[in-house]
């Protein structure tokens, strides 16, 4: 059976393909790789560089979860689609209000992935459950910088942490990604694919 794969499109955008071939897009906007029809689309907040749904080929059954559905009346929602479970979690900083932004924990095929969204270090990060992969923004302008993200990585119980959203207006900035220091760091450039393992 084929393994799940993460294709990093650049900026804050990435695509996950499950073992069964289901396709998940997170914060669509940047790069390429939107050719596969979506089964699920996750939007962490409604900034233009995270919610370009027009790039995606929708199917009749495609489900779209946006921040306004994921955080209702102060409660972070859980979604069970059968083949995947999604738990919304806090995401916020001075540029992104707690009320309008979320992160997501994705559970499928024995894996857990943390899609942090646009955020800085939050009090709640230390309380998140163990996870296989965490993707953290490190641009230092609209989100935390690489140093702060390194502190977040130490808070998380993650097997691997991947720095994304590395520079405003750029798909990927390798030099800034290198500034992210964590013993469990994985560097993934825009256009690269990672096989996800339990």
Which sequence ranges carry the predicted segments?
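Binuclear metal-ion centers of metallo-dependent hydrolases, dominated by the metallo-beta-lactamase
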Residues: 6-7, 72-75, 98, 148-198
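Metallo-beta-lactamase
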Residues: 38-49, 105-172
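Core dinuclear metal-dependent hydrolase active-site scaffold
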Residues: 1-36, 40, 67-129, 144, ...
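Redox-cofactor binding/interface segments in oxidoreductases and associated redox assembly factors
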Residues: 42-43, 87-89, 136, 163
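Short, conserved loop/helix-junction motifs that constitute active-site signature segments
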Residues: 34-36, 54-61, 128-129, 152-157
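Acidic/His-rich segments in extracytoplasmic proteins that coordinate ligands and/or metal ions
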Residues: 49-65, 69-72
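Short internal beta-strands
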Residues: 43, 62-69, 161-165
């Amino acid at each position: 059976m084929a393994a799940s794969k993460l294709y990093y499109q650049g900026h804050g955008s990435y695509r996950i393909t499950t073992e069964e071939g289901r396709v998940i897009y997170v914060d669509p906007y940047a790069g390429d790789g939107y050719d596969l029809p979506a089964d699920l689309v996750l939007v962490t907040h409604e900034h233009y560089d995270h919610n370009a749904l027009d790039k995606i080929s929708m199917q009749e059954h495609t489900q779209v979860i946006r921040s306004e559905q994921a955080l209702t009346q102060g409660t972070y929602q859980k979604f069970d689609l059968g083949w995947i479970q999604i738990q919304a979690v806090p995401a916020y900083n001075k540029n992104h209000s707690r009320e309008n932004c979320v992160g997501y924990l994705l559970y499928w095929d024995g894996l857990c992935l943390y899609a942090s969204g646009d955020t800085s270090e939050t009090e709640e990060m230390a309380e998140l459950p163990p996870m296989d992969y965490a993707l953290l923004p490190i641009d230092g302008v609209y989100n935390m910088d690489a140093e702060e993200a390194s502190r977040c990585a130490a808070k998380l119980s993650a097997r691997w942490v991947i720095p994304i959203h590395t520079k405003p207006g750029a798909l990927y900035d390798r030099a800034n990604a290198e500034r992210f220091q964590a013993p469990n760091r994985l560097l993934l450039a825009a256009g690269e694919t990672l096989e996800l393992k339990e």
